């Protein structure tokens, strides 16, 4: 099924590129065009010497995939603030502030999940359990239930995997933090940087059920389990209530080429071709110059966007941002 969806999303990208009269992606012309529109956000360059195949590969969320059961509505009884930032609400949970880097791999579906899961384990243990959950374990061991690894996957499958098989700890590339740190290096977005070049190539690493040398406990004993996984309705208030009560969530949306140029403000699509689906972590909301927004963490390193974060228009299901919200709860007995 996912092969069909992946093919369809590729076709979408191709047809939209053919029919587009827009400026070349990542071009100065596109930056200038967006900034002349006087919209709610500012454009600039985040990627300099990268191949477009790499950028398309980053968009590895297969939209409209399998759905998790929807949780019961509870927002009606809640008084929600005008703005909310999980980083400030739970300051003793450092993963909420963290931005990771998925490298040359379409693993955003895994990153959005493990980032929000890490946050929630800390939040629901009242700060007692601080763990970077392993994107490597999710990416390499989930298998076909999650899609196709670096070639794209389903956020819903990721949360389901957490409840069924659990996830070990694992930090950033070369961090030697946790049982299974990420094995794909960050690649170079800039002209004269020191990281390897960004390409659209890259196979999914193998599933290894062994922790890296010197780490204990064992792989089996390092697993953190979810006790539930669910989707949240596309109702704006329900999504806000979920984040307010339980912590950051994973979402996914359609990326157009103008989004790649985001620097600050509240993103809304202005111009450019559809690149694919992208999964992210939503950690709050607010209003900027009368424009309501979601506060979102990306997985394209801290030199992208606003130190790795961005804001996107809230309340209008813009680019589908409110249609694919998934989350879950950690098992209390682990704490």
From Swiss-Prot:
Name of the protein: Cathepsin B
Catalysed transformations (reactions): Hydrolysis of proteins with broad specificity for peptide bonds. Preferentially cleaves -Arg-Arg-|-Xaa bonds in small molecule substrates (thus differing from cathepsin L). In addition to being an endopeptidase, shows peptidyl-dipeptidase activity, liberating C-terminal dipeptides
Principal cellular location given in the protein's record: other
A Gene Ontology cellular-component term: lysosome
Organism: Ovis aries
Glycosylation sites per record: 192
Gene Ontology terms describing biological process: cellular response to thyroid hormone stimulus; collagen catabolic process; decidualization; epithelial cell differentiation; proteolysis involved in protein catabolic process; symbiont entry into host cell; thyroid hormone generation
Residue stretch(es) of the prosequence: 20-79, 333-335
Family of this protein: Belongs to the peptidase C1 family.
Annotated disulfide bonds: 93-122, 105-150, 141-207, 142-146, 179-211, 187-198
Keyword Disulfide bond: yes
Organism phylogeny: Eukaryota, Metazoa, Chordata, Craniata, Vertebrata
PANTHER family: CYSTEINE PROTEASE FAMILY C1-RELATED
Tree of life domain: Eukaryota
Membrane topology: Peripheral membrane protein
Residue list for modification N6-acetyllysine: 220
InterPro entries the record matches: Papain-like_cys_pep_sf, Pept_asp_AS, Pept_cys_AS, Pept_his_AS, Peptidase_C1A, Peptidase_C1A_C, Propeptide_C1A
Entry EC no(s): 3.4.22.1
Subcellular location, record wording: Lysosome; Melanosome; Secreted, Extracellular space; Apical cell membrane
Designated gene of the protein: CTSB
One Gene Ontology term of the molecular function aspect: collagen binding
Residues the record marks as active site: 108, 278, 298
Function: Thiol protease which is believed to participate in intracellular degradation and turnover of proteins. Cleaves matrix extracellular phosphoglycoprotein MEPE. Involved in the solubilization of cross-linked TG/thyroglobulin in the thyroid follicle lumen. Has also been implicated in tumor invasion and metastasis.
Keyword set, alphabetical order: Acetylation, Cell membrane, Disulfide bond, Glycoprotein, Hydrolase, Lysosome, Membrane, Protease, Secreted, Signal, Thiol protease, Zymogen
UniProt keyword Disulfide bond, yes or no: yes
Pfam family, one: Peptidase_C1
């Amino acid at each position: 099924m996912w092969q069909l969806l992946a093919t369809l999303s590729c076709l979408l990208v191709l047809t939209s590129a053919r029919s587009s009269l827009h400026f070349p992606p990542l071009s100065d012309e596109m930056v200038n065009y967006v900034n002349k529109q006087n919209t709610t956000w500012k454009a600039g360059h985040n990627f300099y010497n990268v191949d477009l195949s790499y950028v398309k590969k980053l968009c590895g969320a297969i939209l409209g995939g399998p759905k998790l059961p929807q949780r019961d509505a509870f927002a009606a009884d809640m008084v929600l603030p005008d703005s909310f930032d999980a980083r400030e609400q739970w300051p003793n949970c450092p993963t909420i502030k963290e931005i990771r880097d998925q490298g040359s791999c379409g693993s955003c579906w895994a990153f959005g999940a493990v980032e929000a899961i890490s946050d929630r384990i800390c939040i629901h243990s009242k700060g007692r359990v601080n763990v970077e959950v392993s994107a490597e374990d999710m990416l390499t061991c989930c298998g076909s239930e999650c899609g196709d690894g670096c070639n794209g996957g389903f956020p819903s499958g990721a949360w389901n995997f957490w409840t069924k098989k659990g996830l070990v700890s694992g930090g950033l590339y070369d961090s030697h933090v946790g049982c299974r740190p990420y094995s794909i290096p960050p690649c170079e977005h800039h002209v004269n940087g020191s990281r390897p070049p960004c390409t659209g190539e890259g196979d999914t690493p193998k599933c290894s059920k062994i922790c890296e040398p010197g780490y204990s406990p064992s792989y089996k004993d390092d697993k953190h389990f979810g006790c539930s996984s669910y989707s949240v309705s596309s109702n704006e208030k329900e999504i806000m209530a979920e984040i307010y009560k339980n912590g950051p969530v994973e979402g996914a949306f359609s990326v157009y080429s103008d989004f790649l140029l985001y620097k600050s403000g509240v993103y809304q699509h202005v111009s450019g071709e559809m690149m694919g689906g992208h999964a992210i972590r939503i950690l709050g909301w607010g209003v900027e110059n009368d424009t309501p927004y979601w506060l979102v963490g990306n997985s394209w390193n801290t030199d992208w966007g606003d130190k790795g974060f961005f804001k996107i228009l809230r309340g209008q299901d813009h680019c589908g941002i409110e249609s694919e919200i998934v989350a879950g709860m950690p098992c209390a007995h682990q704490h």
